[in-house]
Curated annotation (Swiss-Prot):
InterPro entries: STING (IPR029158), STING_C_sf (IPR038623), STING_LBD (IPR055432), STING_TM (IPR055434)
Function recorded in the entry: Facilitator of innate immune signaling that acts as a sensor of second messenger signals produced by cyclic GMP-AMP synthase-like receptors (cGLRs) and promotes the production of type I interferon. Innate immune response is triggered in response to nucleotides from viruses and bacteria delivered to the cytoplasm. Acts by binding cyclic dinucleotides: recognizes and binds cyclic UMP-AMP (2',3'-cUAMP) and 2'-3' linked cGAMP (2'-3'-cGAMP), two second messengers produced by cGLRs in response to nucleotides in the cytosol, such as double-stranded RNA (dsRNA).
Topology of this chain in the membrane: Multi-pass membrane protein
Keywords, sorted A to Z: Immunity, Innate immunity, Membrane, Transmembrane, Transmembrane helix
Family, similarity comment: Belongs to the STING family.
Gene name in the database record: STING1
Subcellular location: Membrane
Disulfide bond entries: none
Residues that span the membrane, as ranges: 32-52, 59-79, 108-128, 143-163
Binding annotation for 2',3'-cGAMP: 194, 255, 261
Pfam families (alphabetical): STING_LBD (PF15009), STING_TM (PF23417)
Official protein name in the record: Stimulator of interferon genes protein 1
Main location class: membrane
């Protein structure tokens, strides 16, 4: 059957993810490594320049300046966060239930507190030593004024003019790592509220159907993921060759106070003609990922503040997160197929994609069977 089919898996695979485009990966630590390299190179260059000129005073001044500025930056950040406390006090009862400890913990939590404490301690010791050993050089009013400016004025000015605001890249990276994107919430909701309930029961529902149990060869749920996020109410509207032919027996589950809530899957038939006049029928359990329509509606609703470009980004994150969640779910393993595609009804036909996946799977099975045949 695979040799007769008009489509092979690699025909569609040539278009990355069926015209959807590349799926981005989580950001790594390249920015952190680059910053560390800049610090090392800059420090080494300055140290070599001072050493080359045999400037002992220069080395002392370099050590003093590094400790001086580092400590002032740390103290300046603490002062800035004290200013944040002034706002949180107004919300102490509504947000923190009147707990002062929670207010301070939320405001003064640092990601790398051990590292910050270590740097601040070393800087303090270095600064104290320099002031004690070379007090006639460094114990001056102008240095004290500069220290206070760095602690009290510069951090507040940078905050007021917006220099402390995270860039879109940093915001995106933070949201991705902490599951704070809209897409992350939708993916988790889709899994816990639907897929985790129906996928473990899918094989049983297929076997209960006298009509479909022998017609459905791909015993999994095919989940359509259009990049446009637009989902048709009827898949036949997107591709007339994908025709609904019935439903599997429904699963009835008590959920959220609803007794025997009904979950059921639609079965679609695709008829593919061959040049010799014959035709092949395929049956798939296929449906759209319904949360994508929420993203589509949000991008059209002004108050949701989700632009078209941001929606395109969120759908990629949704697919990535859903892939990650399902990949770790033993109860859903082998019972689903995620299908990202462009959503362009003219360029990437749903029927062609499904049949190509089916035929490609058959080719892989045939190849595995040939490999497993023992040689005489």
């Amino acid at each position: 059957m695979a040799n007769n089919s008009p489509f092979r898996g690699d025909d569609v695979a040539r278009q990355e993810h069926n015209g959807f485009g590349p799926l981005s990966e989580l950001r790594g630590n390249t920015a952190t490594i680059t910053s560390a390299i800049v610090v090392v190179i800059s420090s080494a260059t300055l140290l070599l320049a001072v050493t080359w000129n045999e400037m002992r005073e220069g080395i002392r001044f370099l050590v003093f300046t590094v400790a001086f500025l580092t400590l002032s930056v740390v103290l300046g950040e603490i002062v800035r966060r004290l200013c944040l406390v002034s706002e949180e006090i107004k919300h102490k009862h509504a947000r923190y239930r009147g707990d002062w400890k929670a207010v301070l913990k939320t405001t003064f939590t640092f990601g790398n507190v051990e590292c910050i404490l270590g740097v601040a301690t070393v800087s303090t010791l270095m600064l104290c030593y320099q002031l004690y050993a070379y007090r006639e050089v460094f114990f001056r009013p102008d240095f004290a004024i500069l220290f206070l400016l760095n602690c009290l004025v510069v951090p507040q000015l940078s905050f007021l003019v917006g220099l402390r605001q995270l860039s879109p890249v940093e915001t995106s990276d933070l949201n991705e790592k902490e599951n704070k994107n809209v897409a992350d919430g939708l993916a988790w909701s889709y899994y816990f509220g639907y897929l985790r309930l129906v996928l473990p029961r899918l094989e049983l529902r297929i076997s209960e159907s006298e009509y479909f149990r022998h017609k459905i060869t791909d015993r999994k749920l095919f989940i359509l993921l259009p990049k446009t996020c637009f989902t048709c109410d009827d898949i036949e509207q997107a591709d007339s060759r994908v025709k609904w032919v019935g439903n599997l027996p429904e699963s009835k589950i008590n959920r959220g106070g609803i007794k025997e809530r009904s979950y059921k899957h639609a079965v679609h038939e695709i008829v593919m003609p061959f040049p010799d006049g014959t035709e092949e029928k395929y049956h798939f359990i296929v449906e759209y990922a319904t949360p994508l329509m929420s993203l589509y509606d949000m991008s059209r609703f002004t108050d949701a503040q989700l632009t078209g470009s941001e929606r395109d980004h969120q759908v990629v994150l949704f697919i990535r997160k859903l892939t990650e969640i399902l990949g770790k779910s033993e109860e859903c393993k082998g019972r689903y197929e995620l299908i990202p595609f462009s959503g362009d009804e003219d360029k990437n036909k749903i029927a062609d994609i499904l049949v190509a996946l089916h035929n490609n799977a058959n080719i892989m099975v045939d190849e595995e069977a040939e490999v497993s045949i023992p040689t005489q």
